[in-house]
């Protein structure tokens, strides 16, 4: 934590007080939460950015979409549109936001929608002729006007919420006690070989903020063994020693760079959800002469429309469980099968 953020601690106390009052009003029913008559699963975190929500949503889509009609509902952060939008063939990353557009491109058999007002978004989805059977709420842990039936709280292994502080001193959107709303906690971005002892130590620390009711799971990021352009694929091992331009506009891109980087590579870092401007594209083209460009899947959906290059590739990732994958799947499926209302 840098010195400037430490000096902002009084504002963190004030912000924590305001969010605690808001949560208290929802908990007491003074502020209303709206439930819906289908399974609604909310995936989110207590902190800002970098916990791996997108691969976790994609895991749930793969788990459930073979049997159920799925819809994802996101805010569509930094999109250049307003209101409720249901993804369609004319949609792009600027209209939907990068993550929803990635869902739409990757999973053509599901419905993808964006709405800042999640209550209105769900109502619009349920008014469709082919309305969804399950709704996955992306980054909605703090969106308390909707009462989801199942809450999955994510926290990154190297940045556990129990060690964090309220904004602006730290990165917490609400106090650690907000974890009590979680039905399940997933520690993301773990070492693949994390020991059982380390897992148990983290579990004991986390459930103290959850009234000991949530089960804790551990996942790691699994990188694909290939990179993909619009029309071809290359093995990662083939390009690892080649001279490359690595580019990321995501929160906490260090592991992405570490996985691909060799001695002669150049890395470009942009803010999370960055809108690539013409000057950015010019700079990328200049630096990428005689090199392949590798970026994240989320950045690829934004860049590919502006950087028409056969040398632009992305590296897909998945969220996989260190252990207890079947146990996780069963809990989700049991909730869906037993849920007729979220009330």
Curated annotation (Swiss-Prot):
<keyword id="KW-0444">Lipid biosynthesis</keyword>
<dbReference type="Pfam" id="PF02606">
    <property type="entry name" value="LpxK"/>
</dbReference>
<dbReference type="GO" id="GO:0009029">
    <property type="term" value="F:tetraacyldisaccharide 4'-kinase activity"/>
</dbReference>
<comment type="function">
    <text>Transfers the gamma-phosphate of ATP to the 4'-position of a tetraacyldisaccharide 1-phosphate intermediate (termed DS-1-P) to form tetraacyldisaccharide 1,4'-bis-phosphate (lipid IVA).</text>
</comment>
<keyword id="KW-0441">Lipid A biosynthesis</keyword>
<feature type="binding site">
    <location>
        <begin position="47"/>
        <end position="54"/>
    </location>
    <ligand>
        <name>ATP</name>
    </ligand>
</feature>
<keyword id="KW-0443">Lipid metabolism</keyword>
<keyword id="KW-0808">Transferase</keyword>
<keyword id="KW-0067">ATP-binding</keyword>
<dbReference type="GO" id="GO:0005886">
    <property type="term" value="C:plasma membrane"/>
</dbReference>
<dbReference type="GO" id="GO:0009245">
    <property type="term" value="P:lipid A biosynthetic process"/>
</dbReference>
<comment type="pathway">
    <text>Glycolipid biosynthesis; lipid IV(A) biosynthesis; lipid IV(A) from (3R)-3-hydroxytetradecanoyl-[acyl-carrier-protein] and UDP-N-acetyl-alpha-D-glucosamine: step 6/6.</text>
</comment>
<dbReference type="InterPro" id="IPR027417">
    <property type="entry name" value="P-loop_NTPase"/>
</dbReference>
<dbReference type="InterPro" id="IPR003758">
    <property type="entry name" value="LpxK"/>
</dbReference>
<comment type="similarity">
    <text>Belongs to the LpxK family.</text>
</comment>
<keyword id="KW-0547">Nucleotide-binding</keyword>
<protein>
    <recommendedName>
        <fullName>Tetraacyldisaccharide 4'-kinase</fullName>
        <ecNumber>2.7.1.130</ecNumber>
    </recommendedName>
</protein>
<dbReference type="GO" id="GO:0005524">
    <property type="term" value="F:ATP binding"/>
</dbReference>
<keyword id="KW-0418">Kinase</keyword>
């Amino acid at each position: 934590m840098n010195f400037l953020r430490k000096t902002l601690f009084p504002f963190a106390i004030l912000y924590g007080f305001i969010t605690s009052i808001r949560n208290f009003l929802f908990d007491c029913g003074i502020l209303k939460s709206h439930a819906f008559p289908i399974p609604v699963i909310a995936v989110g975190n207590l902190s800002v950015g970098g916990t791996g929500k997108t691969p976790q949503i994609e895991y749930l889509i793969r788990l459930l979409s073979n049997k159920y009609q799925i819809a994802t509902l996101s805010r569509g952060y930094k999109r250049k549109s307003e209101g409720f939008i249901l993804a369609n063939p004319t949609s792009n990353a600027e209209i939907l936001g990068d993550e929803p557009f990635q869902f739409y491109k990757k999973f053509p058999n599901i419905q993808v929608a964006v709405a800042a007002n999640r209550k209105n978004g769900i109502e619009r989805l349920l008014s469709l002729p082919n309305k969804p059977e399950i709704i996955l709420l992306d980054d909605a842990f703090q969106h308390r006007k909707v009462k989801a039936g199942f809450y999955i709280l994510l926290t990154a292994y190297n940045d556990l919420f129990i060690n964090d502080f309220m904004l602006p001193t730290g990165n917490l959107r609400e106090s650690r006690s907000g974890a009590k709303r979680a039905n399940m906690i997933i520690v993301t971005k773990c070492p693949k070989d994390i020991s059982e002892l380390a897992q148990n130590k983290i579990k004991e620390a986390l459930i103290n903020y959850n009234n000991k009711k949530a089960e804790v799971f551990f996942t790691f990021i699994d990188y694909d063994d290939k990179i993909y352009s619009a029309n071809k694929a290359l093995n990662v091992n083939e390009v690892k020693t080649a001279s490359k331009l690595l580019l990321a506009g995501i929160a906490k891109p260090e592991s992405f760079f570490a996985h691909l980087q060799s001695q002669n590579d150049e890395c470009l870092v942009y803010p999370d959800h960055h809108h690539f401007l013409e000057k950015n594209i010019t700079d990328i083209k200049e630096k990428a002469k005689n090199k392949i460009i590798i970026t994240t899947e989320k950045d690829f959906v934004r860049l590919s429309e502006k950087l028409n290059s056969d040398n632009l590739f992305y590296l897909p990732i998945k969220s996989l469980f260190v252990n207890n994958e079947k146990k996780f799947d069963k809990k989700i499926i049991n909730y869906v099968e037993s849920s007729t209302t979220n009330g």
